[in-house]
């Protein structure tokens, strides 16, 4: 009866024939399942972007490894900075540098594990995962930038003799030269990790593009 009703409806049979034969004007994105409800198939642009996302997985993994290594070096240098009573905990900004890099290390470990699993399985990341990753990348980049700026300001003050009471002339007279070198190197690696995190964040924007504009 449903077939007769469809054929008897004005233009019903023609529309169905046009869709089945691929006639001009028929929508190629509409698919009619057995239930009779229309579903939207992904556009070619959407599929192309998602394919590129899968191809970038190896590059994204490389960035995560770089972020991990750089942050490990940064917090290791800061933790080992100790000379004539000068340690990282003496300066609040240096403690912040160490804490942020430790957080980034744990975050990148999780991202490395997820990236490897996605590469092995060949699957496309879920939308919710992409949104969470983008947010965490933004937060991590902000924290790394803030930590690097705070550490650099303290290093500049020490180099200019701003802590003369406790440590002579700071890094100038050699009393805490080793401490200064370790701390400054830690700040430099923090900025390098920040730049890598920014690139990861930009890749996150591209990964979200199919869900936002297509």
From Swiss-Prot:
Protein name per the record: CASP-like protein UU5
Family label: Belongs to the Casparian strip membrane proteins (CASP) family.
Residues that span the membrane, as ranges: 58-78, 100-120, 139-159, 194-214
Cytoplasmic side: 1-57, 121-138
Chain ranges on the Extracellular side, renumbered to this chain: 79-99, 160-193
Subunit architecture: Homodimer and heterodimers.
Pfam families given in the database record: CASP_dom
Lineage, opening ranks: Eukaryota, Viridiplantae, Streptophyta, Embryophyta, Bryophyta
Source organism of this protein record: Physcomitrium patens
GO cellular component: plasma membrane
Family matches, as InterPro entries: CASP_dom
Record keywords, A-Z: Cell membrane, Membrane, Transmembrane, Transmembrane helix
Renumbered residue ranges of the record's region Disordered: 1-20
Membrane topology according to the record: Multi-pass membrane protein
Localization per Swiss-Prot or TrEMBL: Cell membrane
Main location per the UniProt record: membrane
